[in-house]
């Protein structure tokens, strides 16, 4: 559905009104380097053209109505209704709306669609879009930090902050301090993602253990970015968890890779980005306990013609590839993966926005 069709659908579903129609759009977050989902870890991210698009209009009343363009049912929240009366995704939506309880929000009519496939989470894109839409119809002003905190709804805020701080044509550095944007000139390239059914490991507990051990020796540090290689070498004997030690070693080196790439992107040098993404991939293969299906996907892609960079992402990989080589790459990866693993991976083609 294109944008005029989505707008027309809004007017078909909701009664006429003189209130202004607001538009919000947020793409799925793609991590180029670092690890946005890990507490205290730096990351370099961009948003993709797979996105949530949302139209919203103030409603004269004490309720919020939300519909998906893919469904006929309408979610209705009447102000003051206890969250305990809702279940599942509806309860999450209510908790998100109630993050704005202290901001005197107005009622609203909302229609959204999503081009994010079902096997990828749209949680960040939807949450940020909903909070931004409700603030627009209520004339509430907030900066990226506050919007991210509201959208996160008590979850780790980094992915939401990266989403709110994004800028078209740029990637976003999340480290200690305020997010920073750097040019991301990917003209002539697309971002191909390939996904398998193998689950991604939860490494957060090991990393918290390692970070706490280092902070006992260096209490002034507030993030992994602050840990120098010298500090890590001094403190690593105190990290008894050998898995945590490997993970932290990767993260310390990832910080250096991000620094090299952001310096290069100031000059619009994408070659350094591609090189360090590939170096990050090799580091993850060695230290990050990557599953066999993820490894096979990466090895299928990295030797194909036109591929500039490959890196693990979510339940699969991202591949920065020349536009005219995409179809061949998909066919080759699909055939080789199915022949060896036994099923076909799923693919998405998008652009960095």
What spans do the regions from the language model cover?
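Gly/Ser-rich oxyanion-binding loop with an adjacent helix/lid
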Residues: 1-21, 29-41, 87-184, 197, ...
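C-terminal nucleotide
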Residues: 1-32, 42-43, 53-88, 172-310, ...
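Short, flexible micro-motifs
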Residues: 36-37, 126, 271, 315-318
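Residues that flank catalytic or metal-binding motifs in active/ligand-binding sites
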Residues: 50
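Conserved phosphate/anionic-ligand binding catalytic regions in large, soluble enzymes, centered on
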Residues: 159, 309-317
